[in-house]
Amino acid sequence: MKTEQPMRTHYCGEVKVADVGEAITVAGWVHRRRDHGGVIFVDLRDTTGLIQLVFNPEHQDLFSEAEKLRGEFVLSASGTIRNRPEGTINPELPTGEVELLVLSLVVLNTSATPPFHHNEHAHEDVRLKYRYLDLRRNEMANNLKVRHDIIRSLRNFLDKKDFIDIETPILTKATPEGARDYLVPSRTQKGDFFALPQSPQLFKQLLMMSGFDKYYQIARCFRDEDLRADRQPEFTQLDIEMSFVSEEGVLQTMESMIRNLFQEVLSDPLPDPFIRLSYEDAMARFGTDRPNLGVAMELVDVGDLMRQVEFNVFSGPANDKDSRVACLKLKNAKNITRKQIDDYTNFVGEFGAKGLAYIKVDDISTGADGLQSPILKFLDEKTIHSLIERLALANGDIVFFGADKISIVNASLGALRVKLAEDFDQMNSGWFPLWITDFPMFNWGEKEKRWMAEHHPFTAPKVTTTDELIQNPGEALSCAYDFVLNGHEIGGGSIRIHSQTMQEAVFEIIGIGSTEAEEKFGFLLEALKFGCPPHGGIAFGIDRLAMLMTGSKSIRDVIAFPKTQTANCLLTDAPSQPETDQLKELGLSVRAKK
């Protein structure tokens, strides 16, 4: 009986000097072919790396076959491992000291000329259209391997902590924010629609009510919204819920999990404990609830110094309780140009700021005479001295001011803070994890003219009675928390409402009356009657986490088959028009595009 030869005995990138003299078989793709003075060299690539194949002309048939090889041909090559000749060793390759003298070759498949080379920086649209070729690149393959390592580490940690993995439905009910739901028509109940879940939120709460103590799931979620570099219409999150737990209990467990993850996958230790900031403190100091603590600059309030100045741009907001006057100090900026300042003025304008006042420090020893600014003429000597003292100004500093509604100042200076750090190389390297806590329970929707849940309507308030909540919803804080890493919101969660009366009160405050509440959340309200335990949880964005841990610029680089920023799949050309018969069976018709 003839024994079939294996397609490979070794992986390309794992061949070592210790294998010299061994007869081996490798398989993979032609990465590059070179003809050097009658000897043909082929770099063969597989998932582990490269090995150099050598074809000598004395093996005429093999040499003729090698001459026909082209990029991305698929081969199985057998031969003997030998040391590379002196002067040809490649220290950049793990296999750079050895080569395979080929004695047998099987061409398993040919290839058309690829639309881009492995080392070429092709346009992203081309990469997405030919994603199966893009994923052959080391960078992309490594990204998906790291993603796998991330998920494996998270699973192992939670398994050891007695969490259990439970799947929740993909076909479910539309949410109150239904405009962002992907809808799926029901064939059996014409005119009715399922919605794809934006999160497993209610199902994981129901699992706690069912007596499961600790739950997790690597959940696929869907949201129909405008996309950014770190958003996709379908995304993956690590979903977690725990019973009989406090906010502190959730944060401590999750902090241990994240610290373990970075140690296992990247061998990077994270600080212990993570920094914690209240929402109010984060907004005041950084202008955002997801600050990058790798930037040392902070917003400094100077409104109290500006109430009496004869400069309405400052004094107006300084005397308005809904406004703010704050500033940023950039150090070592003596070479900043007028054009750069104009560019930063335009930049903050994108966030609603009407201008960007500044003071540049040339020689602090001469007081006001050592400062440059068009606004100095509006500020008296006492105010200038107070600014110098409060900001600890030094030569080469420049101070940028924001004076407007609180939201505009926070957004504009918060964004400018990061941009200045990037432009002036003042971004500290490393990992800067933190928790944001004590979020407002509600925010007032100017457009909607009603209170809206800051996180979601199932978040528990810090107050203990419905009367306190109803009397002053604008002052109520929630038991919500976000995990922020280097300026990115990676996770968010809360302690949940476990009282039916409190849940009904929250619905009422955000404009969901009893009829609508019963229609959309009747199953939840009913479940809350039957001994619901205190519970809480969190969800982490796997895509965004993988993006940061691989150093990628977009989550599209850590997803095997992502959508574009217009939610298209360039590989499969989805979404597409359905067949007429499909629509008919569903009882649907499509209006023609105008």
Kindly label every feature range from the protein language model.
Residues M1-K594:
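Class II aminoacyl-tRNA synthetase catalytic cores and aaRS-like
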